[in-house]
Amino acid sequence: HEHRGKEFVGINRGEEFEWDCRRKMMRCWLLTRYTRTRWGWFNGITRRINKYLSLCLMPFVHRSKMDFAKGANWVSITQKCAEYVVSQKAFVLSRFNFTFCPDEFFLQTLVWNHPEFRQALYSETDEYEGCMRLIDWKRGNPYVWTSADKEELLHSNRLFARKFDLKDRKIIKWVKETFS
């Protein structure tokens, strides 16, 4: 019960945050669904068109400036926080429409700007400690945990881990048996 009332939301406000925020939240992104197709040449064309349109539309797009926060979209939040986020649907749709990667910003921004939920954050300084996910980006994109990683998983203070693969059924069975 030591974590009761905590919001496990990863917050990233590091050095690259300001640049990333300006790029993703203040510009207008129109063709994002077409930037990751199976045709590589088409991706490059749509990225260039999107950048051009974004720069042309910049003087006409008036996005409210706010205190943004960014983080992983894996969260565990209280029911009260979830109800608050859902109640902000109209604001989220109007402010985050035609932005890039809004799933990394909208919930974190709502929590960051709400005094009660911000105070309940498990960690304001470490994105993955904050969401209590054990995710290894240094060895993979993300790294896939295997049976060889049992000790690391066992000694982690995190509540969840990502990512596993059905190709290694032993680790999945071990996780179920050990933590259920």
Tell where the protein language model's regions lie, with residue ranges:
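ER/Golgi luminal nucleotide-sugar-dependent glycosyltransferases, focusing on the catalytic module
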Residues: 1-180
